[in-house]
């Protein structure tokens, strides 16, 4: 039985997340997903969705066999417990595969690190891009609403 581990924040689920997990699942028999803890996310803005909700959403996805929250103190602890054969990285994850491979070996974790290619057939494959688009549309709509209200009041 080949165990695959995928990791990530999974904030505001989008087609890129699903692609990453589907491609990861194809590499083995079981897909374990480690969802990053809110407190451990330092390389990008804090998630919009709390960790417990992100965990529930990821666990509900078809390719996922098991989903767990990461460890608050030791990122390798869940990996040691799962004992994966393969660890996948998403196309935009900040880990360097070779550096991660060496760190795993130092922890006596014998897993192959595989980078999953980018999913490009969807315009929204980044949570950050989705948040930007929501902010842009909200701004446009509020301006449109203000202009309409001004016209109705005879101010324009």
Curated annotation (Swiss-Prot):
Keywords for the protein's UniProt record, in alphabetical order: ATP-binding, FAD, Flavoprotein, FMN, Nucleotide-binding, Nucleotidyltransferase, Transferase
SUPFAM superfamilies: Nucleotidylyl transferase
Enzyme Commission code(s) on record: 2.7.7.2
Secretion signal span: none
Cofactor names: a divalent metal cation
Family: Belongs to the archaeal FAD synthase family.
The protein's role, per its UniProt record: Catalyzes the transfer of the AMP portion of ATP to flavin mononucleotide (FMN) to produce flavin adenine dinucleotide (FAD) coenzyme.
Protein name (database record): FAD synthase
Species of the source: Methanospirillum hungatei JF-1 (strain ATCC 27890 / DSM 864 / NBRC 100397 / JF-1)
Organism taxonomic ancestry: Archaea, Methanobacteriati, Methanobacteriota, Stenosarchaea group, Methanomicrobia
């Amino acid at each position: 039985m080949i165990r695959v581990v995928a990791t990530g924040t999974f904030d505001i689920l989008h087609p890129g997340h699903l692609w990453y997990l589907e491609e990861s699942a194809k590499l083995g028999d079981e897909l374990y997903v480690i969802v990053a803890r809110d407190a451990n996310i330092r390389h990008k803005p804090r998630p919009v969705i709390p960790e417990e909700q992100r965990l529930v959403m990821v666990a509900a996805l078809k390719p996922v066999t098991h989903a767990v929250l990461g460890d608050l103190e030791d990122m390798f602890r869940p990996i040691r417990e799962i004992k994966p054969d393969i660890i996948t990285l998403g196309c935009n994850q900040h880990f360097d595969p070779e550096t991660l491979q060496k760190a795993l070996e130092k922890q006596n974790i014998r897993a192959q690190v595989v980078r999953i290619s980018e999913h490009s057939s969807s315009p929204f494959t980044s949570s950050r891009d989705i948040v930007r688009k929501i902010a842009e549309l909200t701004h446009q709509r509020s301006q449109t609403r203000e202009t309409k209200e001004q016209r109705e009041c005879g101010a324009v």
